[in-house]
Curated annotation (Swiss-Prot):
It comes from the Bacteria. Transmembrane segments: none annotated. L-aspartate binds at residues 83, 166, 220. Keywords: Pyrimidine biosynthesis, Transferase. It comes from Acidothermus cellulolyticus (strain ATCC 43068 / DSM 8971 / 11B). Carbamoyl phosphate binds at residues 55-56, 105, 133, 136, 261-262. Belongs to the aspartate/ornithine carbamoyltransferase superfamily. ATCase family. Disulfide bonds: none annotated. PANTHER family: ASPARTATE CARBAMOYLTRANSFERASE, ORNITHINE CARBAMOYLTRANSFERASE, MITOCHONDRIAL. InterPro entries: Asp/Orn_carbamoyltranf_P-bd, Asp/Orn_carbamoylTrfase, Asp/Orn_carbamoylTrfase_sf, Asp_carbamoyltransf, Asp_carbamoyltransf_Asp/Orn-bd. One of its GO terms (molecular function) is aspartate carbamoyltransferase activity. It catalyses: carbamoyl phosphate + L-aspartate = N-carbamoyl-L-aspartate + phosphate + H(+). This is Aspartate carbamoyltransferase catalytic subunit. Catalyzes the condensation of carbamoyl phosphate and aspartate to form carbamoyl aspartate and inorganic phosphate, the committed step in the de novo pyrimidine nucleotide biosynthesis pathway.
Length: 323
């Protein structure tokens, strides 16, 4: 059984399907008046965030609390980190407090791997630099599966700033593991060196890719990570790579539009597309909670059935142990 979730590459197909199946069972809680389960009562989970976050931090907090865990939110701002404390010393402090799991977001690629060597509890990567964001990939796969009936054989286009995107890296890996055909669409300046070795296709033209897509994922341009000009203007970028109403019409009728957020409306996605029935952006946020509940549950080895009563019976095998 794995102790950590550091990379989408850590997951076998069976691992990923177990998480998605467990999340589907836990999603039944959303329709209940009381959404909490006692499965992680007495466990302590720390959200250790060195970068700003709205969706991911609050999603992990909601997931942990719905499993009855005690949650400590740690922000680098206002902590001893601002006084020069190293990641290792912070880790040793958390270890001394008896933390069961640490959810870490860090500006440095590889920080979660380092942390995993310093603590006895589980470590979950909530985004490290431009490297990976495995739970985002899991919730995206979960969303695709809910709408399209499965991931295997589906054609997914990921469009935008691939160079700086940890979401793109994790999605390419996980979607390939689950049998999807992935195409990256971006200007050459926003593609990383070595992308030809990734398990996906690459295109510089969006219009030719859209008619063959089952799902299209838009990525924002991460200007905060850019030290130079990667394209002439935002208007020119939007003209070539933005998803507007005209391009939305090129998609098959069943295709869905995803975005990990935050969105830059009018740049990579037009407002009318973001708010259209084809957009599942808000649903991705809701799905993120149940997927992260599943990850926490399986990593921390919950021994009780996740759902009480007859509704839990089909899930007994999937939710009984961990992976």
């Amino acid at each position: 059984m794995m102790r950590h979730l550091l990379s989408a590459g850590d997951l076998t197909r069976d691992d990923a399907l177990l998480i998605l199946d467990t999340a589907a069972e836990l999603a039944r809680l959303a329709d209940r008046p009381i959404k909490k389960l006692p499965t992680l009562r007495g466990r302590t989970i720390v959200n250790l965030f060195y970068e700003d976050s709205t969706r991911t931090r609050t999603s992990f907090e909601a997931a942990a609390k719905r499993l009855s865990a005690d949650v400590i939110n740690f922000s680098a701002k206002g902590s001893s980190v601002s006084k020069g404390e190293s990641l290792k010393d912070t880790a040793l402090t958390l270890e001394a407090m008896g933390t069961d799991a640490v959810v870490i977001r860090h500006w440095a690629s590889g920080a979660p791997h380092r942390l995993a060597g310093w603590v006895r509890g589980s470590v979950i990567n909530a985004g490290d630099g431009t490297h990976e964001h495995p739970t985002q990939a899991l919730l995206d796969a979960y969303t695709i599966r809910r709408h399209l009936g499965g991931v295997d054989g589906r054609r997914v286009a990921i469009v935008g700033d691939i160079l700086h995107s940890r979401v793109a890296r994790s999605n390419v890996t996980l979607l390939h593991t689950l049998g999807a055909e992935v195409t990256l669409v971006a200007p050459p300046t926003l593609l990383p060196v070595g992308v030809e070795s990734w398990p996906c296709a690459v295109s510089y033209e969006l219009d030719g890719v859209l008619p063959k897509c089952d799902a299209v994922m838009l990525l924002r341009v991460q200007r905060e990570r850019m030290q130079a000009a990667f394209f002439p203007t935002s208007r020119e970028y939007s003209r070539r790579y933005g998803l507007d109403a005209a391009r939305l019409a090129l998609l098959p009728e069943h295709a869905i539009v995803l975005h990990p957020g935050p969105m830059n409306r009018g740049v990579e996605i037009a407002a009318e597309v973001a708010d259209s029935p084809r957009s599942v952006v808000v649903e991705q946020v809701a799905n993120g909670v149940v997927v992260r509940m599943a990850v926490l549950y399986l990593l921390l080895g919950g021994g009780e059935p996740a759902l009480a009563g007859r509704a839990a019976e089909p899930a007994a095998a999937a939710i009984g142990g961990g992976w």
